Regions:
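Repeat-associated, polar segments at repeat-unit boundaries in modular proteins
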Residues: 50-53
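Short, charged, amphipathic alpha-helical segments
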Residues: 37-48
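N-terminal acidic leader/helix
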Residues: 1-32, 55-62
Length: 62
């Protein structure tokens, strides 16, 4: 994902970020099951960034 796009996404509200975190985490595990390492790396980078932003905000309500 383009870094600029990711930076924009990280400015989203907490609820949207949580939903996006869950979605990218699910996609990561789908790639894991399919042994798609490129996909795993792609989604891991995104959900790690989102998770870090949510931790900064101290917001983990699902």
């Amino acid at each position: 994902m383009d870094k600029e796009v990711l930076e924009i996404l990280l400015k989203a509200n907490n609820k949207y970020l949580c939903e996006l975190f869950q979605y990218t985490n699910q996609k990561y595990f789908e790639c894991y099951i399919d042994d798609n390492k490129e996909g795993m790396n792609y989604y891991k980078e995104i959900f790690d960034s989102i998770g870090e932003e949510l931790r900064k905000r101290n917001y983990w309500s699902y």
